[in-house]
Regions:
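Substrate-binding pocket helix/loop in short-chain dehydrogenase/reductase
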Residues: 89-90, 97-102, 185, 196
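C-terminal substrate-recognition "lid" of short-chain dehydrogenase/reductases
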Residues: 110, 170, 204-233, 238
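Residue(s) in the substrate-gating loop at a strand-loop-helix junction
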Residues: 134
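Alpha-helical segment proximal to the catalytic Tyr-Lys
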Residues: 118, 163-167, 224
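Conserved glycine-rich cofactor-binding loop
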Residues: 10-11
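Active-site loop immediately N-terminal to the catalytic Tyr-X3-Lys motif
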Residues: 91, 139-145, 167-168, 203, ...
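Active-site helix of classical SDR
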Residues: 113, 150, 158
Length: 239
């Protein structure tokens, strides 16, 4: 069985990705700040391993990645999914909120990728890295400047790493979802949801399954010549 690591795999889109990989026969390691009922129930089956860690802490990340490799072997796939958003115009956003978003969305992804790539390079077996970005990083949205900055940075990291790791047969791509039916959009008002749906050519919010299909493709042999790309899964809202 191939081993996949998923950051932020305990809820929302991350949980859906973990479920899909388990269905496909992967051994999955995931980590986050807190366990969930899904994690506790699924770990008992033996193919899901959960570790409690804050990805913004580089020392903790190194320890957790080492433990994962010791337990399940060097991963073939890494999905950087951990993320958070804090809304507010930049001029009045507290520094603590800025730091929290940057630490989780960008620094955490850098620390996790750095630790995992070291093992991939030593293994010399190629690999796949998928960064979960956002349409917010491609288009400007008022009140989300910090979140947009971190997601755009993930896309930049994707392109640079694709060049660094391509000679070692490790592909690096990002997926930029639009608005999805997850807990991150549950706080939207009916008016806000209606506005998003009206602006989306396909006439609905996205579903985790829409993203999972792209994840599965990027991890497959059919995607072995695809790297350095950001794939928008947004129902056409960016057209």
């Amino acid at each position: 069985m191939k081993h996949a690591m998923v950051s932020g795999g305990t809820r929302g889109l991350g949980e859906a990705i973990v479920r899909a990989l388990l269905e496909d026969g992967w051994v999955v390691s995931t980590f986050g700040r807190h366990s969930t009922a899904f994690v506790e129930a699924t770990q008992a089956a033996g193919h899901l391993h959960f570790y409690q860690a804050d990805t913004a802490d580089p020392a903790a990340v190194e320890r957790v990645i080492h433990a994962m490799v010791e337990r399940a072997g060097v991963p073939f796939a890494l999905i950087n999914n951990a993320g958070m958003a804090r809304e507010g115009v930049l001029a009045s956003m507290p520094v603590a909120d800025i730091d929290a978003v940057v630490s989780t969305n960008l620094s955490g992804a850098l620390y996790v990728t750095r630790a995992v790539v070291r093992h991939m390079l030593l293994e010399r077996a190629g690999g796949r890295i998928v960064n979960i970005s956002s349409i917010i990083g491609h288009r400007g949205y008022s009140g989300l400047a910090v979140y947009a900055a971190t997601k755009a940075a993930l896309d930049g990291m994707t392109r640079a790493l694709a060049r660094e790791l391509g000679p070692r047969s490790i592909t690096v791509n990002s997926i930029a979802p639009g608005y999805l039916e997850t807990e991150m959009t549950h706080g939207l008002s009916a008016a806000q949801r209606g506005q998003i749906v009206r602006r989306t050519p396909l006439g609905r919010l996205g579903r985790p399954a829409d993203v999972i299909g792209v994840v599965r493709f990027l991890l497959s042999a059919e995607a072995s010549f695809l790297t350095g790309q950001s794939i928008l899964v947004d129902g056409g809202i960016s057209c």
